[in-house]
């Protein structure tokens, strides 16, 4: 069909730290060179920051480069880290504090800040607009615009006003637009749905290890002022997880008597009975955590997958007409449990390459090889190289053995131990059969520290237009009940942190798979963990999904 179109020099998909940093850098470079570069950022959330969720302890290295005067410009870095506590939780009641000497160097946070990444992105968007970037929130990029020569020429936004069966709704239908560009950057975050399509189309991961993921579940709490320690960073390993189902937690004291509390569970977990949501709820009852939350009030909830494969899992970064940046590429440094500064730097490097190409008079459609070269020469590459073994060591040797390996690698060899560990088993292939794994009896939520899924999703402010096509696509509708249920007790009903998937009984006693798509918080776990790789997440109508205030 013929669509309306707009033309830009650069289109960027996603207003997160990578996309916004790229946009700002492009405009800075244009101003320095006295040239015009038109830049458009599209964002599927209702506003910039609405879909941003991160810990976040923020390392300001890339921000220092992008805006050296960020303090004067009012960047929301309000709480410097004042202390690091790391515990190994041995059981539901006991814990051992790890002496500072034994903590891997990458886990020290002097000079970093506890922030809301959503608020930092809102600030970055203000800077970008001040530099002349056009930002369009509420518009979901549905697919890449690829010409007959296999060159990416921009993106197509999703149609609006389509009913559940895919038919235009009278008086409401608006076809999506083509946003055409000389170069297109994809900054959709972890497991971006167009990024996934591009990796497959251009075979970008042919020389990479399998990507590995975690699911991060997070809450914001208002706590008793007498328990509040602004700047305190607490991390834990161990209980409620184990060597076959690994992960770790965080509890960060920010300003205004608030804490961020969360649990990250590696999606390589093997027990299909495990529920990341319920593991997080019971984790909050541990004395190390409970001491801060008791008497407080939960005010926000959300979840998001993270890419943690690191350097060994990076796909090829470029293709004709564009590039992947940030978590769409997989630049998170798992040894630091930080991805914001690395995402920003990747966006800045890509922007430099595009500015150089446009200044040389190139018309787009080519591969940005100078982005790849600059990446390999940057501190970002050095950081990812030094942390390349971190996740694989935990997968291979468990939390304790992997922790010992990482201590030696990071603290003695500075991340340059003369061996590279590889982990090429994808996360979805790690599940045991339900009959081979122990069942897990989760305690009922008490409504004070622990809660159910529905009341949690309510706090994410998630909303979707109900009469639209379901954005969670099953390649084969029979697989959930006929294969996943007998083999794995259909893990989707547990791995989803928002209650999207249910196995329900029909009147005749048979089972059916129900998808409550309106609950979806866009975490992407189903797209990653489904053992049959039968679920594909695609973008719903723009503005749909969570509306995180300051996650």
Swiss-Prot record:
Q: Which reaction does it catalyse?
A: a ubiquinone + reduced [electron-transfer flavoprotein] = a ubiquinol + oxidized [electron-transfer flavoprotein] + H(+)
GO terms assigned for molecular function: 4 iron, 4 sulfur cluster binding; electron-transferring-flavoprotein dehydrogenase activity; metal ion binding
Q: Binding positions for FAD?
A: 10-24
- UniProt-listed Gene3D superfamilies: 3.30.70.20, 3.30.9.90, FAD/NAD(P)-binding domain
Which biological process, per GO, is one annotated for this protein? electron transport chain
Q: Which InterPro entries match?
A: 4Fe4S_Fe-S-bd, ETF-QO, ETF-QO/FixC_UQ-bd, ETF-QO/FixX_C, FAD/NAD-bd_sf
Any note on cofactor binding? Answer: Binds 1 [4Fe-4S] cluster.
- Name the UniProt key words of this record, in alphabetical order: 4Fe-4S, Electron transport, FAD, Flavoprotein, Iron, Iron-sulfur, Metal-binding, Oxidoreductase, Transport, Ubiquinone
Enzyme Commission numbers on file? 1.5.5.1
Domain spans labelled 4Fe-4S ferredoxin-type: 511-540
Q: Where is the signal peptide?
A: none
For the ligand ([4Fe-4S] cluster), the binding residues are 496, 520, 523, 526
Q: Which cofactor does it need?
A: [4Fe-4S] cluster; FAD
Pfam families attached to this UniProt entry: ETFQO_UQ-bd, Fer4_ETF_QO, NAD_binding_8
Q: What does this protein do?
A: Accepts electrons from ETF and reduces ubiquinone.
Family label: Belongs to the ETF-QO/FixC family.
Q: What is this protein called?
A: Electron transfer flavoprotein-ubiquinone oxidoreductase
């Amino acid at each position: 069909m013929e669509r309306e179109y707009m033309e830009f020099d650069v289109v960027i998909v996603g207003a997160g730290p990578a996309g916004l940093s790229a946009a700002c850098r492009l405009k800075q470079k244009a101003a320095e060179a006295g040239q015009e570069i038109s830049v458009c950022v599209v964002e599927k959330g209702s506003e910039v920051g609405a879909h941003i969720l991160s810990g976040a302890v923020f390392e300001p290295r890339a921000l220092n480069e992008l805006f050296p005067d960020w303090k004067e410009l009012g960047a929301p870095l309000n709480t410097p880290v004042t202390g690091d506590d790391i515990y190994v939780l041995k059981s539901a009641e006991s814990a051992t504090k790890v002496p500072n000497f034994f903590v891997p160097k990458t886990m020290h946070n002097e000079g970093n800040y506890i922030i809301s990444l959503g608020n930092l992105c809102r600030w970055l968007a203000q800077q970008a607009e001040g530099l002349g970037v056009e930002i369009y929130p509420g518009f979901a990029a549905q697919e890449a615009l690829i010409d007959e020569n296999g060159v990416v020429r921009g993106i197509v936004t999703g149609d609006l006003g389509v009913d559940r069966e895919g038919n235009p709704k009278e008086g409401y239908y608006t076809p999506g637009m083509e946003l055409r560009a000389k170069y297109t950057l994809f900054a959709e975050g972890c497991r971006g749905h167009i990024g996934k399509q591009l990796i497959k189309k251009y075979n970008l991961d042919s020389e990479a290890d399998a990507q590995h993921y975690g699911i991060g579940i997070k809450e914001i709490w208002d706590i008793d002022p007498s328990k509040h320690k602004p700047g305190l960073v607490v991390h834990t390993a161990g209980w409620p997880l184990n060597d076959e189902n690994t992960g770790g937690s965080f509890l960060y004291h920010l300003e205004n008597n608030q804490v961020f509390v969360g649990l990250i569970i590696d999606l390589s977990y093997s027990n299909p009975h495990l529920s990341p949501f319920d593991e997080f709820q019971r984790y909050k009852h541990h004395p190390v955590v409970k001491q801060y939350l008791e008497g407080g009030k939960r005010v926000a909830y959300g979840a998001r997958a993270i890419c943690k494969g690191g350097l060994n899992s990076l796909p090829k970064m470029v293709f004709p007409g564009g590039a992947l940046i940030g978590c769409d590429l997989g630049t998170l440094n798992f040894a630091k449990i930080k991805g914001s500064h690395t995402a920003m730097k990747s966006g800045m490097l890509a922007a430099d390459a595009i500015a150089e190409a446009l200044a040389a008079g190139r018309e787009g459609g080519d591969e940005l090889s100078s982005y790849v070269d600059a990446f390999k020469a940057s501190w970002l590459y050095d950081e990812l190289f030094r942390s390349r073994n971190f996740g694989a060591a935990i997968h291979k040797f468990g939390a304790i053995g992997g922790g010992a390996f990482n201590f030696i690698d990071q603290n003695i060899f500075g991340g340059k131990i003369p061996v590279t560990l590889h982990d090429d088993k994808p996360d979805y292939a790690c599940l045991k059969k339900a009959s081979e794994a122990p069942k897990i009896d989760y305690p009922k939520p008490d409504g004070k520290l622990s809660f159910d899924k529905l009341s949690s999703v309510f706090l994410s402010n998630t909303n979707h237009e109900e009469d639209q096509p379901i954005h969670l696509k099953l390649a084969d509708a029979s697989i959930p009940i006929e294969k996943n249920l007998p083999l794995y007790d259909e893990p989707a009903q547990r791995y989803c942190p928002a209650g999207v998937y249910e196995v329900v009984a029909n009147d005749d006693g048979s089972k059916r798979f129900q998808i409550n798509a309106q609950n979806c918080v866009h975490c992407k776990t189903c797209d990653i963990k489904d053992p049959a790789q039968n679920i594909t997440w695609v973008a719903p109508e723009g503005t749909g999904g969570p509306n995180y205030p300051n996650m």
